Curated annotation (Swiss-Prot):
Record family assignment: Belongs to the ETS family.
Basic residues composition-biased segments: 171-181
Signal peptide: none
Protein location: Nucleus
Keyword vocabulary terms for this entry: Activator, DNA-binding, Isopeptide bond, Methylation, Nucleus, Phosphoprotein, Transcription, Transcription regulation, Ubl conjugation
GO terms for biological process, alphabetical: positive regulation of DNA-templated transcription; regulation of transcription by RNA polymerase II
Top-level taxon: Eukaryota
Gene: Elf2
Residues bearing the modification Omega-N-methylarginine: 496
Record protein name field: ETS-related transcription factor Elf-2
Keyword DNA-binding in record: yes
Length: 593
């Protein structure tokens, strides 16, 4: 009987022999040797088990004797016999692999609950994960020194160590090196494609290919079409306008200052073989993408700046939203008077934070003639208004129609210098002057187109309370055909005007219409009409010559406190209005680039 004991950190193999091997070696040499594996709890915590290996020839009683002896020494030990048959004379020596496997072997699950010695016989050529099979030759194991190097996380080396079957020379010391770890796939889901680690792209830390770099240049307005441009975008054909500059940019990207077009051209020719790029024959510095990329940014040469009219159509659907503001938030606009006497600059404070909008202010052409407020100002085709586009912060105000006002166009049709914004008219006149409020949702940067400094003159703002305006009636003479009145009906924001309004000859009239760009299904624009009686209009004509006329949206609350009416008031000559009004003076609004 030969006993081999390997401790947990052991590198020596002790083989005490009692001569039993020599007595029975001639009869049972070709028979089947067996290996008894007994996991024994180790006193050292670094390695899990110590192993006792016994090589014997008699299969009858020796297993039981050893098991009983081991059971006395350790009460919680479990005994396993793993036996294999040697197949032929060419059986290999697996002593080192068996010793390594024994150090890592745990007790079989079928034997964990049993404390009695159990003998398990494993038939030949059957391999189960519960047992370790090792064929040990008695003539080889006698003088073998086993050195075991183990790691708990590393797999066992299953390759056999070939030995000559008829060699009876003493074997020298063998060393088992650590097997290199196998590369674990980043995604272990069974897919062989995902397990392949991708090759590092374009050197150290750079993840942009040359063809991707050229595609980025084609989508950059700073380089396209200055250095590179599309010749046929739908076919993916582009041209290097400045090949030297493109190669310098590529060298700067790759951190290679000596990059030139010849070096970059070799990389481009590499893409010919890959099927990414192709050289257009007959044209110099012209290449083509074989597969045109999608979702690229198109840079046009003659792309002009987006005009406000184009932006107005895009943002038209966003302009109809309700905004609840206080009465102090007013939309003010006035005609720009050149050379006015009351042009002292003041800053007008804003009540709330405004929204960037565009205000169109149309000023009349001056012919030098002064007219009184009671005279009729006919519309002349030659008097083309001058429009100044000013970008400034204006508050958003709700009108009586419930629409959002973001741009105001004020046009004066009379040609007199310093003449009132609203003039008198007679029933026989073709049309009356109107002030139009347009809903033009336009967003522009805060700068004027021509860079002019636009200064609005101080204006007198007339506020007509809702309770007084509702009681105001339009008086008509008995010889006229009809009459009209202003009524505030329905919802608090509804203002209705009854037409036609017939008035006497020479009476100043203020008429305001509010057309707007509205979606289908909305209420049509309503017209607010009011009567201005001006008995002293002639005497006050020169005094009010330089007063700037103002358009204002006023939100008033009724006496009962539950109704709020928004009015649009245009004031011509404040002293000529006979209605019960209150007058206050506002500061000027200064807009500059």
């Amino acid at each position: 009987m030969a006993s081999a004991v390997v401790d947990s950190g052991g590198s020596a193999l002790e083989l005490p022999s009692d001569g039993g091997e020599n007595q029975e070696g001639g009869d049972t040499g070709p028979d089947c040797p067996a290996v008894i594996v007994e996991p024994v709890p180790s006193a050292r915590l670094e390695q899990g088990y110590a192993a006792q290996v016994l090589v014997y020839d008699d299969e009858t009683y020796m297993m039981q004797d050893v098991a009983e002896e081991q059971e006395v020494e350790t009460e919680n030990s479990e005994t396993v016999e793993a036996s294999v048959h040697s197949s032929n004379a060419h059986c290999t020596d697996k002593t080192i692999e068996a010793a390594e496997a024994l150090l890592h072997m745990e007790s079989p699950t079928c034997l964990r609950d049993s404390r009695s010695p159990v003998e398990v016989f494993v038939p030949p050529c059957i391999s189960t994960p519960e047992f370790i099979h090792a064929a040990m030759r008695p003539d080889v194991i006698t003088e073998t020194v086993v050195e075991v190097s183990t790691e708990e996380s590393e797999p066992m080396d299953a390759s056999p160590i070939p030995t000559s079957p008829d060699s009876h020379e003493p074997m020298k010391k063998k060393k088992v090196g650590r097997k290199p770890k196998t590369q674990q796939s980043p995604v272990s889901n069974g897919s062989p494609e995902l397990g392949i680690k991708k090759k590092a792209r374009e050197g150290k830390g750079n993840t942009t290919y040359l063809w991707e770099f050229l595609l980025d240049l084609l989508q950059d307005k700073n380089t396209c079409p200055r250095y590179i441009k599309w010749t046929q975008r739908e076919k993916g054909i582009f041209k290097l306008v400045d090949s030297k500059a493109v190669s310098k940019l590529w060298g700067k990207h790759k951190n290679k200052p000596d990059m030139n077009y010849e070096t970059m051209g070799r990389a481009l020719r590499y893409y010919y073989q890959r099927g990414i790029l192709a050289k257009v024959e007959g044209q110099r510095l012209v290449y083509q993408f074989k597969d045109m990329p999608k979702n690229i940014v198109v840079i046009d040469d003659d792309k002009s700046e987006t005009c406000p009219e184009d932006l107005a159509a895009a943002a038209d659907d966003k302009s109809l939203e309700r905004v609840s503001l206080s009465a102090e938030s007013l939309l003010k606009a006035a005609t720009a008077v050149r050379g006015g006497k009351n042009s002292s600059p003041l800053n007008c404070s804003r009540a709330e934070k405004g929204v960037a909008r565009v205000v169109n202010i149309t000023s009349p052409t001056h012919d030098g003639s002064s007219r009184s407020p009671t005279t009729t100002a006919p519309v002349s085709a030659a008097a083309a208004p001058r429009t100044v586009r000013v970008a400034m912060q204006v508050p958003v105000v709700m009108t009586s129609l419930g629409q959002k006002i973001s741009a105001v166009a004020v046009q004066s049709v009379n040609a007199g210098t310093g003449s009132p914004l609203i003039t008198s008219t007679s029933p026989a006149s073709a049309s009356s002057p109107k002030v139009v409020i347009q809903t033009v949702p336009t967003v522009m940067p805060a700068s004027t187109e021509n860079g002019d400094r636009i200064t609005m003159q101080p204006a007198k703002i007339i506020t007509i309370p809702a309770t007084q305006l509702a009681q105001c009636q339009l008086q008509a003479k008995s010889n006229l055909t009809g009459s009209g009145s202003i009524n505030i009906v329905g919802t608090p924001l509804a203002v209705r005007a009854l037409t036609p309004v017939s008035i006497a000859h020479g009476t100043p009239v203020m008429r305001l219409s509010v057309p707007a760009q509205q979606a289908s299904g909305q209420t049509p624009p309503r017209v607010i009409s009011a009567l201005l009686k001006g008995p002293e209009g002639k005497s006050e004509a020169k005094k009010q010559e330089h007063d700037v006329k103002t358009l204002q949206l006023v939100e008033e609350k009724g006496a009962d406190g539950n109704k709020t009416v928004t009015h649009v008031v245009v004031v011509s000559a404040p002293s000529a209005i006979a209605l019960p009004v209150t007058m206050k003076t506002e500061g000027l609004v200064t807009c500059e680039k």
